[in-house]
Regions:
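Glycine-rich phosphate-binding loops at beta-strand->alpha-helix junctions
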Residues: 119-143
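Phosphate-binding glycine-rich/basic clefts of nucleotide- and phosphate-handling proteins
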Residues: 13-97
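Short, surface-exposed connector motifs at secondary-structure boundaries
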Residues: 16-18, 120-125, 147-150
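Acidic, glycine/GT-rich loop-and beta-edge segments that sit at the periphery of enzyme/chaperone cores
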Residues: 47, 66, 167-179
Length: 179
């Protein structure tokens, strides 16, 4: 049904990973949580595509200044008939709370294991989020609030890791050519 992905949290210095952890939490887990929430709270069965639309359009990891909503269609689990309900960003905040908490805990764990001299660099330069999960509204704010460290999303979060890896490979090739 869902392919398993991970969220990787790392402190990188001089092209190498100093401290890292990987948790079995990613975008698909957000979708699963929304499906479960809709079933439990509204007796509404929705598919993964609908859950992803909810996540993209009104999903929240942090309280929005104004509540946003969208109409969601699914199958009423009591009657078996199609049903449309209005879902709010506050509901997605609740649905995603457990998963976003796991991400924050993993970030906190990596920061605790970071050597003091690098911890100072992280405090100065901040935390950079990459990948699809970083596009969830409010994840930056949540991590920043819980860690006290400036948090931002990479310019192109969906390709940032791949581009960075490519640049590092080019760098290594250049180093080898110089030897």
């Amino acid at each position: 049904m869902y392919k398993r992905q991970t969220a990787d949290i790392a402190v990188i210095s001089l092209g190498g990973t100093v401290v890292s952890t990987s948790i079995k939490v990613a975008g698909d887990n957000f979708d699963e949580a929304i499906v479960r929430y809709m079933r439990k709270t509204h007796n509404l069965l929705i598919g993964e595509r609908t859950a992803e639309e909810i996540k993209i359009n009104i999903g929240s990891a942090y309280q929005r200044p104004e509540v946003v909503s969208m109409d969601v269609r699914g199958r009423n689990l009591v009657t078996g008939l199609p049903k449309t309900i209005t879902v709010t960003s506050d509901e997605t905040l609740e649905a995603l709370k457990e998963i976003t908490s796991q991400i924050v805990e993993a970030v906190h764990s990596v920061l605790e294991k970071t050597p003091p001299e690098l911890a100072a660099d992280v405090a100065d330069r901040g935390i950079v989020l990459t990948g699809g999960g970083s596009l969830l509204y409010g994840l930056e704010e949540l991590i920043e609030e819980k860690t006290g460290i400036n948090t931002m999303t990479a310019e192109d979060p969906m390709t940032a890791v791949a581009v960075g890896t490519g640049k590092f490979v080019e760098f290594l090739a250049g180093v080898r050519d110089d030897e």
